[in-house]
């Protein structure tokens, strides 16, 4: 009898231990985000098309606002809701603030030694602080007002000189405008760098939008050697560095008092002053210069291009905007930057374009630096994080008739593009939000107001406005696939 009691006692103890272990195991089990069925080796690559923001949006409708994809074996979190974006860029901003290492970005952007692609840390903080102080602060942006005035006036005059029956390529005009302004602000002179630099810039931006399978499936890295991508990256990277070397040599030869101090002068002065305490290598200066030039050129160009396309496609909206701008400019010689703040409808058009056609449909990739729980899902450290800005901006739960171009919606709401409202995030938010939004919008709004004030627009070749091709081109920054060709008729007094 005693032996039987001992047997039962031991059995109960063993059962209790087993139950506790099972309960502990269940409570510690991770809950990953929803994920589609993946294929061996390639993961979910087969589900991603050339316009990745559209592919992600389609998948999110099935798998939810937060989903886990695998590019090869690498985990990639795709966030497609305002709530998820808020977690990433506000509530848990610090652990989502770094950048992943991607080979094409490393080669062309100086291994993350600038601002945009730098890992989160002291270097990034120092570099960002310098860019803000010397180029992107409200005070500095205001100081470039003369440059914006001269360059926008030059664009208007160039369009005016074209014959009324001659088609104007607005896409080319906008590229030249943004190049001219940013070159003068960063480099001090419009011609510094030259046309060769502009061509290199276009190639770099195109390559940044390309995909390197070797980043995610290392043993398939040979594919980019076969298809020529590696060779093209190396060729363009070498040309870019040569151009940057030329710029630095030129500015180091400058005599004191030769010209007004600009961004490059400031960087070189900082390098000289810190050489004995905390030396700054040339690659850091090159990276900062290229960050500012590339970020300030392509995004503003894309925004102007989409704006004029939507306005031409929607003539009533164009007429409403023209009426406002022309009323403000009545009995004046033209539009100035001070006039822009008197134009609420123009401000609404600006916001609606950044909602409907954000230049960065997918915000720059982030990397999670520690394990996290977000919206009830467990996400491991090292996961690449993509915020689908395009999906958020067209979310029908946030926006009425989200596919419709309707600036009036912003006359009825306080939602803005400055990163405080997560319903639209054209410039991102939080620590890694774009520091150049003030610079970009100052040029965008002045150029737009002058264009609609000075000209009436229509399509050439008898094309109807409603048939205007609005197809997107694949790329790092989302442009129209075809250039915007119009007839511009000078306004009748």
Swiss-Prot record:
- Pathway, according to UniProt? Secondary metabolite biosynthesis; terpenoid biosynthesis
Q: What is its EC number?
A: 1.14.14.143
Topological region Lumenal? 20-493
Keyword Metal-binding on entry: yes
Q: What is its main location?
A: membrane
GO MF terms here are:
(+)-menthofuran synthase activity; heme binding; iron ion binding
Q: Which residues are glycosylated?
A: 169
The protein here is known as (+)-menthofuran synthase
């Amino acid at each position: 009898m005693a032996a039987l009691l001992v047997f039962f006692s031991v059995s109960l103890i063993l059962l209790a231990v087993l139950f506790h272990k099972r309960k502990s195991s269940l409570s510690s089990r991770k809950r990953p985000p929803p994920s589609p069925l993946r294929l061996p080796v390639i993961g979910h690559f087969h589900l991603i098309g050339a316009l990745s923001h559209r592919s992600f949006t389609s998948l999110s409708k099935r798998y939810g606002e937060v989903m886990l994809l695998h590019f090869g074996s690498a985990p990639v979190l795709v966030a497609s809701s305002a709530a998820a974006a808020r977690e990433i860029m506000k509530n848990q901003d610090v652990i989502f603030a770094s950048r992943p290492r991607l080979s094409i970005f490393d080669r062309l952007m100086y291994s993350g030694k600038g601002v945009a692609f730098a890992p989160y840390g002291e270097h990034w903080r120092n570099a960002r602080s310098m860019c803000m102080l010397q180029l992107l602060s409200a005070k500095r942006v205001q100081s470039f007002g003369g440059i914006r005035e001269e360059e926008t006036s030059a664009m208007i005059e160039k369009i005016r000189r074209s014959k009324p029956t001659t088609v104007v390529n607005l896409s080319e005009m906008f590229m030249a405008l943004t190049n001219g302004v940013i070159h003068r602000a960063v480099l001090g002179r419009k011609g510094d760098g030259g046309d060769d630099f502009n061509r290199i810039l276009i190639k770099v931006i195109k390559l940044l939008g390309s995909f390197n399978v070797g980043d995610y499936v290392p043993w398939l890295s040979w594919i980019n050697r076969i298809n020529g991508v590696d060779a093209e990256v190396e060729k363009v990277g070498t040309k870019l560095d040569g151009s940057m070397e030329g710029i630095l040599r030129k500015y180091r030869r400058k005599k004191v008092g030769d010209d007004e101090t600009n961004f490059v002068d400031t960087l070189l002065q900082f390098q000289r002053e810190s050489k004995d305490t905390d030396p700054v290598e040339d690659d850091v200066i090159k990276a900062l210069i290229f960050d500012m030039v590339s970020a300030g050129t392509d995004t503003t160009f894309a925004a102007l291009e989409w704006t004029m396309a939507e306005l031409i496609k929607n003539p009533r909206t164009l007429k409403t905007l023209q009426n406002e701008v022309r009323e403000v400019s009545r009995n004046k010689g033209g539009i100035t930057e001070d006039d822009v703040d008197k134009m609420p409808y123009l401000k609404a058009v600006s916001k609606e374009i950044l909602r409907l056609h954000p230049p960065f449909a997918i915000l720059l990739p982030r990397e999670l630096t520690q394990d996290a729980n977000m919206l009830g899902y467990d996400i491991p450290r090292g996961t690449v994080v993509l915020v689908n800005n395009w999906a958020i901006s067209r979310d029908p739960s946030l926006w009425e008739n989200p596919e419709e171009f309707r600036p009036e919606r912003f006359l009825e709401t306080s939602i803005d593009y400055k990163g405080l409202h997560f319903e639209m995030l054209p410039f991102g938010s939080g620590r890694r939000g774009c520091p150049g939004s003030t610079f970009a919008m100052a040029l965008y709004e002045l150029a737009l107001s002058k264009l609609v004030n000075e000209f009436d627009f229509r399509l050439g070749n008898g094309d109807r406005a409603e048939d205007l091709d609005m197809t997107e081109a694949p790329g790092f920054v989302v442009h129209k696939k075809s250039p915007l060709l119009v007839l511009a008729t000078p306004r009748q007094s």
